[in-house]
Amino acid sequence: MTADNQTARRLIELNTEFYRLQAASFSQTRHSAWAGWERLADGLSLGNHAKVLDLACGNLRFERFLQERFPRTRLEFDAIDNCPALSAGAEGIPVRDLDLAQALLEGQGPELSEHDLAVSFGFMHHLPTFEMRCALLELLARATAPGGVFAVSCWQFMDDEGLAAKAEQTTARGISELGLTGLGPRDYLIGWQTRPGVYRYCHHFDDAEVDALAAHLAGRAQLVDSYRADGRTGRLNRYLVFKRTRLG
């Protein structure tokens, strides 16, 4: 475990407050589809109708990407997030308001029906413990129909020299300003647009941890793809793509 429950709870609250207060400016910088989504889509066979789950859907740009990429498929979305302001203005796609990080910390993940595709992008790095990250994978597996696909992204921002330097600086400053203790290895506090006192908690994934996450589902899901994509370097996220076999 990278953080005790008290620290984990505080980090979750920090992120909830960040997105609540910075939703407008954050969403304005989040319009383009991720390059890594294209590779995922290349391997999908969604047919005429597909149920899609998106955990921590943000401003619904993945939903818009799928609609453009699969115009002949009737897509039925189950989108979940705990920041309604991020999806404000989006039409035709209802979003369920749920604090998923808090639910995973308490071991109370939501009951979900089975989907043809289940994803969670830009969220895994906001989960403060390895156990919670495993729980997210288990939740996605349970919410995927046999033969269906589920995928996650793991942010590897410390592999980018510029991002790493900023993360080191903002983390030191944030720990001092917030009086935080208990951060684990590869845990950072990231600033936002040089705004004073504004931080969000993010975890950097090294390849060993990503491999351990993939191994956690051995026997319950088949890892069908693992690759790096996104950002200026094309390597900012590591993706794990699974095919649901059975539940264990």
Region annotations inferred by a language model:
Residues 1-53, 58-109, 131, 149-248:
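Class I (Rossmann-like) S-adenosyl-L-methionine-dependent methyltransferase catalytic domain
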Residues 49, 114-115:
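Local beta-strand N-terminus motif with an aromatic residue
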Residues 110-111, 142:
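Short, charge-rich binding segments
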Residues 119:
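A conserved beta-strand element that flanks and buttresses the S-adenosyl-L-methionine
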Residues 122-126:
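Short catalytic micro-motifs in class I SAM-dependent methyltransferases
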Residues 127-139:
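A short, conserved alpha-helix within the catalytic core of class I
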Residues 139-146:
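Conserved helix-to-beta-strand junction in the class I
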